[in-house]
Curated annotation (Swiss-Prot):
Name the record gives this protein: Probable octanoyltransferase
An example Gene Ontology biological process: protein modification process
Protein location: Plastid, Chloroplast
GO molecular function terms attached to this record: lipoyl(octanoyl) transferase activity
Record organism: Cyanidium caldarium (Red alga)
Gene: lipB
């Protein structure tokens, strides 16, 4: 059984603290619960723990920019109100065999959400995430501590293109981001939001999940 936590809009710093707290509780109590956190962030840039600062075009000391170096893998990415973000906290029984399977499952989740609107997407060899015609729509980055995962994926719906263009997302030279509403201009954000909520509700009912909303 999976516990689903829905925060709505939450700043990145707070969500990061919440994730780490949940992970360390799981480890300390030797729990193997599955937690899935759904939310949106205000404007923020995050760098993976080994990310290259050359991939950002603004000064990293600029106090007007919300920038954080975090403990996930991957390079730089951008979050804002126009994304659906899913953070999963899951215990991997056999880490060596399950990491690639886990990443593939996260990518499959992103693809299934896009398929709700009959949007075909693909994976790109050596680059985690989901792409539509060489443009990235789903970003992915995870961290594993003692076989317990956290961080997850983000799906672009109506992100600020201007802010996204200030970075070399995931360190890919030709990696251009794309928004869902660029592909489906007839679908409003409200329509997308409610269809997404209905699908989650069906999944919740079928899986008998516990749901906590904030």
């Amino acid at each position: 059984m999976m516990l689903i936590i829905r925060y709505g809009l939450l700043n990145f710093e707070t969500s990061w603290v919440h994730q780490k707290t949940m992970v360390f509780i799981q480890i300390r109590k030797r729990q193997k619960k599955k937690l899935s956190i759904y939310l949106k962030h205000p404007q923020v840039y995050t760098l993976g723990h080994r990310a290259n600062k050359e991939y950002i075009s603004f000064c990293s000391n600029n106090t007007l920019v919300n920038l954080h170096r975090v403990d996930r893998g991957g390079e730089v990415t951008y979050h804002d109100y126009g994304q659906v973000i899913i953070y999963n906290i899951t215990h991997l029984q056999k880490i060596n065999r399950n990491v690639n399977i886990y990443i593939a499952n996260l990518e499959q989740l992103g693809k299934r959400i896009l398929l709700l609107y009959k949007t075909k997407s693909t994976k790109k060899e050596k680059f985690p995430g989901i792409w539509i015609q060489q443009k990235k729509i789903v970003a992915l980055g995870i961290k594993i501590i003692q076989r317990t995962t956290f961080h997850g994926l983000s799906i672009n719906f109506s992100c600020s293109k201007r802010n996204y263009e200030l970075i070399l997302a995931c360190g890919i030279k030709d990696g251009i981001s794309v928004n869902f509403n660029e592909i489906h201009k007839k679908n409003s954000q409200n329509q997308f939001y409610w269809k997404y909520k209905i699908v989650l509700l069906i999944v919740d009912i079928l899986a008998f999940n516990n749901i906590i909303s904030f």
